Amino acid sequence: PIFGQAQYAQIPMAVVGIVMKFFQIVISVAIGMAAGCIPIVGYNMGAGHCGRVKKLFALLLGAEAFVGVLSLLIVEGFPGQLIAVFGASGESVYYTEFAVRAFRVYLCMIVLACINKAAFIFLQAMGRAFASTLLSMIREVVFGVGLALLLPPFFGLNGVLYSMPVADVLTFFASVVVIGFTWRFLRRDDVA
């Protein structure tokens, strides 16, 4: 492959840095929205308004999904322009082709990444810090790092790109299980 040649070896590193920067911007928005719910969740949990907590969680998931879908549409619809924003307008054809592929593959599950962050922070706000920390560590360390190390020997550079979307999908399923289990312990009767 072309990236095995010395003059092109820096391309994957530069591209992954750009992709990670865009990912961090989107995730920062997702974290900000979820963090804004923390005092509201804490108050309503303390006051016994579990119905409100469930409604807020549904609203938050909808907002996070919207941010994720909007980001995905930008990545899928305008990859060249997105790459140019990060100062890569005069690069080689190999750079541009790889950057477009990297954006589309690495960020194909950004909707789930946003939802996962919301679930982690919401669990923390509900007083379930252990579950929140466990899910976060599973996503970042077990799935994120683990898949980034396991997939490349079998899939090469594509293994690195697919590691995060696969981690997001696996973490999403784990989050669904933990949230479902947590909901069982919330009282069905609402005080207000």
Language-model region placement:
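Helix-terminus/linker motif at the lipid-water interface of multi-pass membrane proteins
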Residues: 1-18, 25, 43, 83-91, ...
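Hydrophobic/aromatic end-of-helix segments at the C-terminal termini of transmembrane alpha-helices
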Residues: 3, 37, 78-82, 147
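Short hydrophobic/aromatic segments of transmembrane alpha-helices and their interfaces
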Residues: 7-8, 65-66, 113-115, 125-126, ...
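Small-residue-rich hydrophobic transmembrane alpha-helices
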Residues: 15-73, 77-79, 113-135
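Alpha-helical membrane-interface segments at transmembrane helix boundaries
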Residues: 17, 23-26, 96-104, 139
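Short runs within selected transmembrane alpha-helices of multi-pass transporters and secretion channels
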Residues: 31-34, 106-125, 131-140, 147, ...
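Short alpha-helical transmembrane segments in multi-pass integral membrane proteins
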Residues: 41-108, 151-192
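Alpha-helical transmembrane segments of compact multi-pass small-molecule transporters, enriched
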Residues: 85, 142-144
